[in-house]
Amino acid sequence: MEVIAENRKARFEYFILEEFEAGMVLLSSEVKSLRERKVNISDAYVVEKNSEVWLHNMHIAEYKAANRKNHKPKRERKLLLHKKEINKLIGQIKTAGITVVPLSVYFNDKGFAKTKIAIVKGKKLYDKRATIKQREWDREKSRLSKNNL
């Protein structure tokens, strides 16, 4: 599994409730840009439309060599999931305070572009502070243990 892009902001901003692996409907120029790692998913989110799930606001840069057949960088991309997973996501999207965001984009072992999406709930400011405090304490513990050896 070759990770192309990771949404580190999502892991800090949200509590992750459940994760799914989804395929994406992409154009050939988009796949070539993904192979060059020219993608940004930090502002992306998932929306339900006509009983399908769509990925919005994911930026895949235009591929230089594809002149006329190029794609729009921020176009909507359809996500490929099983029907049960789609129904579960749609139910969660309609719940207040819950959203679905991509966590990472990668190529699987067969060479297909996949995205890991998650059902998330927003953190409050004090939750973010607690996360920072815990991270700093873990770093301090590792420093102390290295110095004692």
UniProtKB/Swiss-Prot annotation:
HAMAP family, per database record: SmpB (MF_00023)
Keyword RNA-binding applies: yes
UniProt cross-references to NCBIfam families, sorted A to Z: PRK05422.1 (NF003843), smpB (TIGR00086)
One Pfam family matching this protein: SmpB
Family under the similarity heading: Belongs to the SmpB family.
Function, as annotated: Required for rescue of stalled ribosomes mediated by trans-translation. Binds to transfer-messenger RNA (tmRNA), required for stable association of tmRNA with ribosomes. tmRNA and SmpB together mimic tRNA shape, replacing the anticodon stem-loop with SmpB. tmRNA is encoded by the ssrA gene; the 2 termini fold to resemble tRNA(Ala) and it encodes a 'tag peptide', a short internal open reading frame. During trans-translation Ala-aminoacylated tmRNA acts like a tRNA, entering the A-site of stalled ribosomes, displacing the stalled mRNA.
UniProtKB keywords: Cytoplasm, RNA-binding
Gene Ontology biological-process entries: trans-translation
Stated name of the protein: SsrA-binding protein
Subcellular localization, as worded in the UniProt entry: Cytoplasm
Gene Ontology MF annotations: RNA binding
Cellular component aspect of the GO annotation: cytosol
Name of the coding gene: smpB
